[in-house]
């Protein structure tokens, strides 16, 4: 299994009301660390193009063995534990059970690529009562948004919500949106209001926030973006204490910055036969560092 540590990407974080800086504060002690995995997308099927589905089990084992050597507050998977088929979950979750740190999961589009009869069972299988969630770790609040909430794949075909999402998708296609793709999705107005409340509560508690989702929000030319990415970016833009938005979905990875928020798209584990991308994020008072493994980039030009 091939992975190696990559050099650090240092992301400067502004203090509330203070302009951002990429300068690392040498005196800062780490406040917490967490692991990041994106798109294992396992299924017992032959490789297709650059996607090596079966190899993801061995990659997960190697990744988890490495993560277990670090003192992590938690590890988060940014969606798509499986590629398809409900039976694919068990082998994947057996590997995750070896994690020493708590495991947080973001639901992804492929996690619902199961038979209609199994779709209502997916969230329970992932141990999720809700796709969107919030948890605090000291001075940090981690918020997960659920971009599968409005989508043509989340619910059985007979569910009215599937027809509503399909209608929205066709409207977006008619309007020429590059992210009007059936494998994307959207968050509801109710979830947007919840996000606003969570970010306001974080500010009142003097916490910085990191938001995690499956779908990218930026850059605008990425066809993998959430259908209503602009609405989420607008909410984030009102809250300068949001340090970063972390996501998967686009297996190539990506990076953007808007205002004081860093938008980091982590590479998909399912890509390539042996290269194994994952990362460890370390949170300091005024910056983040991302330690990439395997092909996960260092993005050193931002330092």
Predicted regions and their residues:
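N-terminal export signals
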Residues: 1-25
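N-terminal active-site segment of His-dependent metallophosphoesterases
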Residues: 24-90, 190
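Alpha/beta-hydrolase fold active-site loops
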Residues: 32, 73, 132, 140, ...
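Solvent-exposed loop/turn segments at secondary-structure junctions
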Residues: 40-43, 81-84, 109-113, 148-151, ...
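Alpha-helix N-cap and loop-to-helix initiation/capping positions
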Residues: 51-55, 186-187, 224-227
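Extended active-site neighborhood of metal-dependent phosphoesterases/phosphodiesterases
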Residues: 87-205, 231-241, 256-292, 302
């Amino acid at each position: 299994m091939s992975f190696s540590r990559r050099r650090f990407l240092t992301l400067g974080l502004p203090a509330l009301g203070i302009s951002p800086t990429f300068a690392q504060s040498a005196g800062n002690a780490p406040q917490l660390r967490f692991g990041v995995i994106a798109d294992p997308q396992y299924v017992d099927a032959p490789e297709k193009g650059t996607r090596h589905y079966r190899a993801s089990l061995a990659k997960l084992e190697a990744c988890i063995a490495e993560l277990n050597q670090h003192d992590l507050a938690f590890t988060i998977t940014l969606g798509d534990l499986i590629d398809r088929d409900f039976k694919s979950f068990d082998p994947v979750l057996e590997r995750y059970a070896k994690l020493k740190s708590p495991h947080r999961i973001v639901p992804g589009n492929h996690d619902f690529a199961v038979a209609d009869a199994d779709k209502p069972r997916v969230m329970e299988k992932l141990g999720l009562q809700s796709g969107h969630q919030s948890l605090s770790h000291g001075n940090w609040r981690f918020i997960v948004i659920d971009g599968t909430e409005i989508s043509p794949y989340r619910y059985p075909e007979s569910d009215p919500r599937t027809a509503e999402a399909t209608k929205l998708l066709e409207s977006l296609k008619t309007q020429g949106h590059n992210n009007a793709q059936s494998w994307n999705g959207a968050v509801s107005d109710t979830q947007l209001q919840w996000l606003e409340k969570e970010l306001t509560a974080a500010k009142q508690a003097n916490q910085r926030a990191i938001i995690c989702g499956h779908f990218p929000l930026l850059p605008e030319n990425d066809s993998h973006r959430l259908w209503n990415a602009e609405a989420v970016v607008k909410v984030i833009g009102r809250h300068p204490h949001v340090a970063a938005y972390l996501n998967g979905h686009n297996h190539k990875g990506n990076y953007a910055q808007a205002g004081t928020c860093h938008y980091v798209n982590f590479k998909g584990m399912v890509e390539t036969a042996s290269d194994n991308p994952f990362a460890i994020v370390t949170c300091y008072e005024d910056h983040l560092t991302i330690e990439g493994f395997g092909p996960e980039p260092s993005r050193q030009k931002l330092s």
